[in-house]
Structure formats: structure tokens, C-alpha cells
């Protein structure tokens, strides 16, 4: 079984808990998620199954969309409402000042990842060190906030939708907004509404998954999140060359290679998605596709 499930992770479960549920349901080991969602957060968690685990990096690299609630006037050790309160301050900013501060984060900005995170430094996850009372210096990371829409500002609460790059911590965004306003802030609610091409309206709950007799009925194809990529469709006569990982020349294809040098493409054998390639150039300026990864299972 190969494909992707769009799971609605409930609060209270880790992303790995969801993977374990799917493994047990399918009686398969080759199952993986595509980007950790905080245990207390809910939302879209695409789960790759079988050969689809080989494309998980493409999903990890995709944009994410969240609905979040920021509570101003509080600072905690975890940067969310569930942590130990370190400091409380009065919120004196007006709604207009709050709006301006929130929207000022649109674009690229440098984040320092929270100590309570799954990032590994020298083989240790940061949250493991944090639980031991150890805090270490973390390098800044550049993230991108593509869009923010403020839904509501009510007293110290701000509800907003945010579209962001991979690796963006919404907890840290909330903390940073609070710092700009001089009162501190924490994330008090988080729902991931989209991850790459997967959205909340097509996600299924754990209960719905458990009730299914045939999971393949809702399994999405491996190339579902890759529709933005160019396709190189190989004629069936050249199947052996493709499956052996040989170079793919224009005459092997239904259509010629139009993509520029260095562009990655999805490789199909007729209608079957079989892997990834990259456009290269020979010395005599003949383009070809070099196979980067094959997804088929050898028999």
C-alpha cells in the first residue's frame, strides 16, 4: 500500500502517536508524518505510507497555514499557555497598535527556536534538555511569514490566520509579537488548517480512520502534493532504462524536455508515477533527465 492520508490530529496526541495508530491500523511499519505538530495543537497532519515516505521531504518543505490565538501579557517557559508562567504584565496597547505589531511580521524574519522543541543539537532534542532545566544557545533561523489575517482582537486576545514557511514556530511568533508590544505574549490555541496541498476540509479524524474497512478508499496518490512540478512522461518502450535508473533523453519521452537545466521533475512511466529526476545537460548541449529517486518496489 502506497499513498498519503490526510489526518486531522486531535489535541493531546503527539504526531508520533498518530503514526503509531496508522501503523497499527494498516499493520505496516513504513509510515511517517510530514512535520511535527505540537501535542496540544490540532489540525492537518499528512501521513505518508509505504513508498510515499520517500516524498515526505517535499511535504516538509511546503507552506503551512494556521489559525492561532495569541494571549498578551503573559510569558511562559514554553512560549504557550501550558507552560510555567515566568512573568505577567499589563497590556496597555490599543487594538490599532496590536494590529500594527502583528502585521509587522509579514515577510522574512529571524526566529530563535524555543527550547521546548524537537530540534536536535548534538543528538539531543531541545525539549529533553529543557525538561532537565538546561538551556542552551540556539542559532537564529530565517523564516517567512507570507500572509497574516487578523480575525479578532478582544482585550488581551488576538485571533489570526497565518501562512508561513516550513520551520516557523507559531509559539515563537506569538512571543515575539508580545515582545514588540512590551507586554509579552504566548500562544493559547493552534489549529493547522493546511499543509502543502492538504487542507482541513478534506482531513479525516482518528475515529473515522479506525472505522474504515478499506483505508485504500481514502488513500491519496503519492503525486497528489506534487501537481506544481513538471512531468516527464516516458514511453513504455523505455521502461527498462527508467527502472534501471539510466539517463532519460528527449526521444524517450512523450514530449520533449522544455524545463531549464537544474529543474526537478516528476517522472512517469506512461500514467504511473515512478520517481523524481533533474534536468541535466551533456557536453554537446543535449538535455537529459537524471534519475534522483525511484519509488517503485523491486519484486
UniProtKB/Swiss-Prot annotation:
Q: Which residues form a coiled coil?
A: none
Question: Has UniProt tagged this entry with the keyword tRNA processing?
Answer: yes
Active site annotation, chain numbering: 38 (nucleophile)
**Short name of one Pfam family:** TruB_C_2
Keywords (alphabetical) are: Isomerase, tRNA processing
Enzyme Commission number, as recorded:
5.4.99.25
Record's keyword annotation contains Isomerase: yes
Molecular-function GO terms, alphabetical: RNA binding; tRNA pseudouridine(55) synthase activity
UniProt catalytic activity: uridine(55) in tRNA = pseudouridine(55) in tRNA
The processes (GO biological process) annotated in the record are: mRNA pseudouridine synthesis; tRNA pseudouridine synthesis
The family this protein is said to belong to: Belongs to the pseudouridine synthase TruB family. Type 1 subfamily.
Per the entry, what this protein does is: Responsible for synthesis of pseudouridine from uracil-55 in the psi GC loop of transfer RNAs.
What is the protein name stated in its UniProt record? Answer: tRNA pseudouridine synthase B
Amino acid at each position: 500500500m502506497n499513498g498519503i492520508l490526510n489526518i486531522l490530529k486531535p489535541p493531546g496526541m503527539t504526531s508520533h502517536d498518530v503514526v503509531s495508530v496508522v501503523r497499527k491500523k494498516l499493520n505496516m511499519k513504513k509510515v511517517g508524518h510530514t512535520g511535527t505538530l505540537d501535542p496540544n495543537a490540532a489540525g492537518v497532519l499528512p501521513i505518508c505510507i509505504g513508498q510515499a515516505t520517500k516524498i515526505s521531504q517535499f511535504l516538509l518543505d511546503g507552506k503551512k497555514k494556521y489559525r492561532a490565538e495569541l494571549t498578551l501579557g503573559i510569558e511562559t517557559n514554553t512560549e504557550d499557555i501550558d507552560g510555567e508562567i515566568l512573568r505577567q504584565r499589563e497590556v496597555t496597547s490599543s487594538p490599532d497598535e496590536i494590529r500594527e505589531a502583528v502585521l509587522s511580521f509579514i515577510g522574512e524574519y529571524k526566529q530563535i527556536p524555543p527550547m521546548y522543541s524537537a530540534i536536535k543539537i548534538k543528538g539531543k532534542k531541545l525539549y529533553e534538555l529543557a525538561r532537565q532545566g538546561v538551556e542552551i544557545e540556539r542559532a537564529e533561523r530565517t523564516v517567512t511569514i507570507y500572509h497574516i489575517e487578523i480575525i479578532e482582537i478582544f482585550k488581551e486576545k488576538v485571533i489570526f490566520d497565518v501562512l508561513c514557511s516550513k520551520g516557523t514556530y507559531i509559539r515563537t511568533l506569538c512571543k515575539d509579537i508580545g515582545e514588540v508590544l512590551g507586554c509579552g505574549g504566548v500562544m493559547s490555541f493552534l489549529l493547522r488548517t493546511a499543509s502543502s496541498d492538504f487542507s482541513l476540509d478534506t482531513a479525516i479524524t482518528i475515529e473515522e480512520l479506525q472505522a474504515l474497512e478499506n483505508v485504500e478508499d481514502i488513500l491519496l496518490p503519492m503525486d497528489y502534493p506534487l501537481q506544481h512540478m513538471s512531468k516527464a512522461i516516458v514511453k513504455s518502450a523505455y521502461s527498462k532504462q527508467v527502472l534501471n535508473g539510466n539517463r532519460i533523453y528527449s526521444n524517450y519521452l512523450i514530449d520533449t524536455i522544455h524545463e531549464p537545466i537544474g529543474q526537478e521533475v516528476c517522472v512517469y512511466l506512461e500514467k504511473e508515477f515512478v520517481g523524481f529526476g533533474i534536468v541535466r545537460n551533456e557536453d554537446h548541449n543535449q538535455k537529459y533527465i537524471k534519475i534522483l529517486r525511484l519509488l517503485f518496489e523491486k519484486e
